[in-house]
Curated annotation (Swiss-Prot):
Pfam family, one: Sld5
GO biological process, alphabetically ordered: chromosome segregation; DNA replication; double-strand break repair via break-induced replication
Protein name as catalogued: DNA replication complex GINS protein PSF2
Gene it is expressed from: PSF2
Organism: Phaeosphaeria nodorum (strain SN15 / ATCC MYA-4574 / FGSC 10173) (Glume blotch fungus)
Organism classification: Eukaryota, Fungi, Dikarya, Ascomycota, Pezizomycotina
InterPro entries per the UniProt record, alphabetical: GINS_A, GINS_bundle-like_dom_sf, GINS_Psf2, PSF2_N
Segments of this protein annotated with the region Disordered: 89-110, 209-242
Length: 242
């Protein structure tokens, strides 16, 4: 008998979707354009930069046909500034990249993976939705394209720990009817924290249901014992009669 699938996307599935994100490559040799489901890939002409899906960039890197240009936010200086922001603001996450302006009212807004949040034109001070997956994949496959890969890896690890601790602390203070602001949370963070968050919410629901059942039992016992109201209710009735 097959076990039931967990709710939501698993971390491997999130990483798979991340491979559709656009990154910038510097080709080493000329390659013809490709017609893909996500759109047409322009011909690669060295040394001109080109934006391609992450999966294609990783393939070209393994074949030594291109180098990958890390996005501006994925360097030591930018990650240090973002980490300082995360530490200084313990109740909010660093703001995500701004969405591009909508061309017209008749067109749909652009969304991942068709944004330039991980290309060479990305903002240097904002973490995109797939920041953790992008960073780990690029460091694993193209560490030689980074100026200081060890420090970048260390900063990514620090960012992950600080943000996950912030996510847990925000969920722990919830009550049955409360909420937590999660603007700026990344895809892998949602996937990894889903079990913890759902566990806390389920616990709050059980506590609320138990309290409601206790209240109903107390009301039923009071009715069975001939309870006719509190002193405050008696005073209110007396004032109405006057």
């Amino acid at each position: 008998m097959a076990l039931p699938l967990p709710p939501g996307l698993t971390p491997p599935e999130i990483a798979f979707l991340c491979e559709m994100e656009l990154v910038t490559v510097i080709p080493r040799q000329r390659l013809e354009g490709l017609e893909l489901l996500g759109g047409r890939i322009k011909p690669l002409n060295p040394p001109h930069r080109t934006n391609v899906p992450l999966w294609l960039a990783l393939l070209l890197k393994r074949q030594r046909r291109a180098n990958i240009l890390p996005p501006p936010w994925l360097n030591s200086h930018s990650l240090t500034a973002i980490l300082d922001h995360e530490i200084d603001h313990d109740e909010t996450f660093s703001p995500p990249p701004r969405l591009p302006p909508q061309p017209s009212a008749n067109t749909l807004p652009t969304s991942p993976p068709f944004l330039s949040d991980n290309t060479a034109d990305a903002a240097p001070d904002a973490l995109p939705y797939h920041w953790l997956e992008i960073g780990e994949m690029l460091l694993e496959a193209a560490s030689d394209d980074f100026e200081d890969p060890d420090n970048v890896r260390k900063l990514l690890r620090g960012l992950r720990e600080v943000r996950m601790a912030k996510l847990r602390s925000g969920v722990e203070v919830l009550d049955a009817g409360g909420g937590v602001k999660m603007n700026g949370v990344g895809g892998m963070e949602v996937g990894e924290g889903r079990a913890f968050v759902t566990g806390v919410i389920d616990g709050l629901r059980k506590i609320a249901a138990s309290r409601e059942q206790q209240r109903r039992d107390r009301d039923r016992e009071e009715l069975e014992n001939g309870y006719s109201g509190t002193a405050a209710d008696y005073d209110d009735d007396e004032m109405d009669m006057q």
